[in-house]
Swiss-Prot record:
Domain notes per entry: Rel Similarity Domain (RSD) allows DNA-binding and cooperative interactions with AP1 factors. The N-terminal transactivation domain (TAD-A) binds to and is activated by Cbp/p300. The dephosphorylated form contains two unmasked nuclear localization signals (NLS), which allow translocation of the protein to the nucleus.
Source organism of the structure: Sus scrofa
A GO biological process held by the record: positive regulation of transcription by RNA polymerase II
Keyword ATP-binding found: no
Protein name, per record: Nuclear factor of activated T-cells, cytoplasmic 1
Biased composition (Polar residues): 192-206, 808-822
Ranges: Sequence repeats: 195-211, 225-241, 274-290
Amino acid composition bias (Low complexity), ranges on this chain: 225-242
UniProt-listed SUPFAM superfamilies: E set domains (SSF81296), p53-like transcription factors (SSF49417)
Function: Plays a role in the inducible expression of cytokine genes in T-cells, especially in the induction of the IL-2 or IL-4 gene transcription. Also controls gene expression in embryonic cardiac cells. Could regulate not only the activation and proliferation but also the differentiation and programmed death of T-lymphocytes as well as lymphoid and non-lymphoid cells. Required for osteoclastogenesis and regulates many genes important for osteoclast differentiation and function.
Residue numbers spanned by region 3 X SP repeats: 195-290
InterPro entries with a match to the protein in the record: Ig-like_fold, Ig_E-set, IPT_dom, NFAT, p53-like_TF_DNA-bd_sf, RHD_dimer, RHD_DNA_bind_dom, RHD_DNA_bind_dom_sf
Chain location of the short sequence motif Nuclear localization signal per the record: 257-259, 672-674
SMART domains: IPT
């Protein structure tokens, strides 16, 4: 413990002329400094009392009522920072009342000063601050005069309201409102008044010794490292790492943030926070000078500091995190002073836990920390997530999530079908945002488009949603450059409401049961957005001038009994919104054929607009990734070409051996960049069976069917039809005692492309004219065996069957039955 006095490594006495009579007092003060501890959190902007009082705040054990700006000295000591022992010029300091024209405090010249400090009276390990300073500090131990090296007074050198680069690397001003609270939590040993050895750097002057005690700010130095770094420290204010973190062996720089100028006047505080925030978050709550209205005392101890260091990883002690900026009161009332009190540990002598306004269960990890009137100056913000007091519905309705607008939905499902009864016109001039409306979308034959929902029998009305979608070869989605526009007026008969879903305007139209769920769309126009506004969006790749076709997309949501929602969607034909494109680009509205065999050669008539004599029709097959696999130009008949119609010969497909239909596209081209939208076309396989339709006089009967039951005579009856294959199901044939087969076998069914005349010889249509075995003039005897000598059937032959005499028919049946079975 005596190494402090014996170590002369950083003794600067040989550099400066000190009074040798004060060396003893300086040594005694250094001894007392090791047992002194200055508290934090005390603002230096307290009101200044005029009378020289004593130290009224009590201290327990090693606790002292001192501010971050610590000044050692007595009120009656004649020497101070205002006077220099070297006889330097005193004109560098402005008068106490001097201020600059803009209201800021007067600038004062910086200087280098070395000051020795004395400790307080130590008696049995306790400090008594409630005695007069004159009694505590005897004459031999009073603070010596300060050795001052004054520099020239440069007005533009440094503003006292700003920190110098040599003082701190912190980006906050010492007088800013945002940093006033953290400035008051500066380390005591960071002040030039409490450091045993000073850093030889230029730093602004702090409070005079004789000004510290009248303000009730006692001076103590922290029990810590005996030496300070001679270099600057990255920060002097308390942050999360320094206030709650472990104490390092090398304290911060002796330079500190101060709230008083060299002339003794209180510095002006900016009402706004510092424009450059600190790179480290700090537990500040932006307490201004007005909120510190009296002496504030903090009780600390070494045990509490050790406990805080051990729990420094807990974030629940962040004082400023729970107070948002907008939660602060705008009008500060003069309420009791703020006090952040820390209970001393149980082993502290004479420790009395102060009263607390908060129950200890609010801070379980830190029950020894008490809050005084800390939240009196701010709106009440609870520490835990705010429980909304808004009453909730006793039976909350969980609305199912509706599909997004870019989802591909069917137009019919089950008994429901959403259908466009009247298609819109192929061209509509969209209006810009800067011009008036151009009216609602019209239909081709006059009037307006209409939409109807079929299969809905409920009495509840539904909502029909309408938005503008794309009309290119990609998947249907909301159009980026066009929006729906609500049309109102005396001529509009349909009510509507405009909504926005995912940055897309949606027009909501009611579907009423009294109107058969039908709506006339006379309230929808098309609005053109500016290309520059859309093309600059993030992720937008479309170009507005090349994407001028749209579709009217209708969507309806039908609630189901099981709580689900059925969504149907249907899109209209493409609508050209550009006037120039409508006059130049070809448009296909209708095609006479939708499919053809792969051999091609079939003619197709296209109906639309802007067809020319040299218009070309190109068939294209695309890969799943969009690349063209096959392209073929079809032949057009120039003699039959008209501006609104075009005759084209379908080309053969590239693969003649396909086994399933293949869907391709085609478009009409009037030039290099004048193409129509892609139209769909389907190629069918070429090996589809084709059956001749010419009748024949001698029909070969089909193979007989085997018996179906052991109790019956194996007598069977043939089914007239083409000899295709043996039916797999024996019950499909006419058997004695059984009605005729209701349908044909799957093997014997003709292809879909066959002529409807070929069903005359089939089993199913032929059986329609039979009511039973008696239809052929055969009666069933008692034994269940057919007889061939029965009378002919009274009715005439089947209209579609060949003209066969009943007698010849029965004879052929008997002859066939007498032949041996294979």
């Amino acid at each position: 413990m005596t190494g402090l006095e014996e170590d002369q490594e950083f003794d600067f006495d040989f550099l400066f002329e000190f009074n040798q009579s004060d060396e003893g007092a300086a040594a005694a003060g250094a001894t007392a400094e090791r047992y002194s501890y200055a508290t934090t959190g005390i603002s230096s902007a307290l009101p200044l009392p005029t009378a020289p009082p004593t130290l009224p705040a009590p201290c327990h054990d090693q606790q002292a009522s001192a501010a971050g700006i610590s000044a050692v000295g007595s009120a009656g000591h004649p020497a101070g920072y205002a006077g220099a022992v070297d006889g330097g010029p005193s004109g560098y300091f402005l008068p106490s009342g001097g201020v600059r024209p803009n209201g800021a405090p007067a600038l004062e010249s910086p200087r280098i000063e070395i000051t020795s400090y004395l400790g307080l009276h130590h008696n049995n390990g306790q400090f008594f601050h409630d005695v007069a300073v004159e009694d505590v500090l005897p004459n031999p131990r009073r603070s010596p005069s300060t050795a001052t090296l004054s520099l020239p007074n440069l007005e533009a050198y440094r503003d006292p309201s700003c920190l110098s680069p040599a003082s701190s690397l912190s980006s906050r001003s010492c007088n800013s409102e945002a940093s006033s609270y953290e400035s008051s939590f500066s380390y005591p040993y960071a002040s030039p008044q409490t450091s045993p050895w000073q850093s030889p750097c230029v730093s602004p002057k702090t409070t005079d010794p004789e000004e510290g005690f009248p303000r009730g700010l006692g001076a103590c130095s922290l029990l810590g490292s005996p030496r300070h770094s001679p270099s600057t420290s990255p920060r002097t204010s308390v942050t999360e790492e320094s206030w709650l973190g472990a104490r390092t062996s090398r304290p911060s720089s002796p330079c500190n943030k101060r709230k008083y100028g060299l002339n003794g006047r209180q510095l002006f505080c900016s009402p706004h926070a510092s424009p450059t925030p600190s790179p480290h978050s700090s537990p500040r709550v932006s307490v201004t000078d007005d909120t510190w209205l009296g002496n504030t005392t903090q009780y600390t101890s070494s045990a509490i500091v050790a406990a805080i260091n051990a729990l420094s990883t807990d974030s629940s002690l962040d004082l400023g995190d729970g107070v948002p900026v907008k939660a602060r009161k705008t009008a500060l009332d003069h309420s009791p002073s703020l006090a952040l009190k820390v209970e001393p540990a149980a082993e502290d002598l004479g420790a009395t836990p102060p009263t607390s306004d908060f129950p200890p269960e609010e801070f379980p990890p830190f029950q020894h920390i008490r809050k005084g009137a800390f939240c009196d100056q701010y709106l009440s913000v609870p520490q835990h997530p705010y429980p909304w007091a808004r009453p909730r519905s006793p039976t909350p309705y969980a609305s199912p999530s509706l599909p997004a607008l870019d989802w591909q939905l069917p137009s019919h499902s089950g008994p429901y079908e959403l259908r466009i009864e009247v298609q819109p016109k192929s061209h509509h001039r969209a209006h810009y945002e800067t011009e008036g409306s151009r009216g609602a979308v019209k239909a081709s034959a006059g009037g307006h488009p209409s939409v109807q929902l079929h299969g809905y029998v409920e009495s509840e009305p539904l909502t029909l949603q309408l938005f503008i979608g794309t009309a290119d070869d990609r998947l249907l989605r909301p159009h980026a450059f066009y929006q729906v526009h609500r049309i109102t007026g005396k001529t509009v008969s349909t009510t509507s409401h405009e909504a926005v879903l995912s940055n897309t305007k949606v027009l909501e139209i009611p579907l009423l049961p009294e109107n058969n769920m039908r709506a006339i769309i006379d309230c929808a126009g098309i609005l053109k957005l500016r290309n520059s506004d859309i093309e600059l969006r993030k992720g937008e790749t479309d170009i507005g001038r090349k994407n001028t076709r749209v579709r009217l997309v209708f969507r309806v949501h039908i609630p189901q009994p099981n709580g689900r929602t059925l969504s149907l969607q249907v899109a209209s034909n493409p609508i050209e919104c550009s006037q120039r494109s409508a006059q130049e680009l070809p448009l296909v509205e209708k095609q006479s054929a939708a499919s053809c065999p792969v051999l091609g050669g079939k003619r197709m008539v296209l109906t639309g607009h802007n067809f020319l004599q040299d218009s070309k029709v190109v068939f294209v097959e695309k890969a799943p990734d969009g690349h063209h696999i096959w392209e073929m130009e079809a032949k057009t008949d120039g003699d039959l070409c008209k501006p609104n119609s075009l005759v084209v010969e379908i080309p053969p497909f590239r693969n003649q051996r396909i086994t399933s239909p293949v869907q391709v596209n085609f478009y009409v081209c009037n030039g290099k960049r004048k193409r129509s939208q892609y139209q769909h076309f389907t190629y069918l396989p070429a090996n589809a069976p084709v059956i001749k339709t010419e009748p024949s006089d001698d029909y070969e009967p089909a193979l007989t069917c085997g018996p179906v039951s052991q109790g019956l005579n194996p007598l069977t009856k043939p089914c007239y039809g083409p000899p295709l294959a043996l039916p797999p199901d024996p019950s499909s044939c006419l058997v004695a005692g059984f009605p005729p087969c209701p349908q044909r076998s799957a093997v014997m069914s003709p292809p879909p492309s066959a002529s409807p005349k070929l069903h005359d010889l089939s089993c199913a249509p032929y059986s329609k004219g039979m009511a039973g075995p008696g239809h052929l003039g055969l009666q069933r005897p008692a034994g269940g065996v057919l007889g061939g000598q029965e009378a002919p059937r009274p009715g005439g032959p089947h209209p579609g069957a060949p003209q066969l005499h009943p007698l010849n028919l029965s004879q052929s049946i008997v002859t066939r039955l007498t032949e041996p079975q294979p």
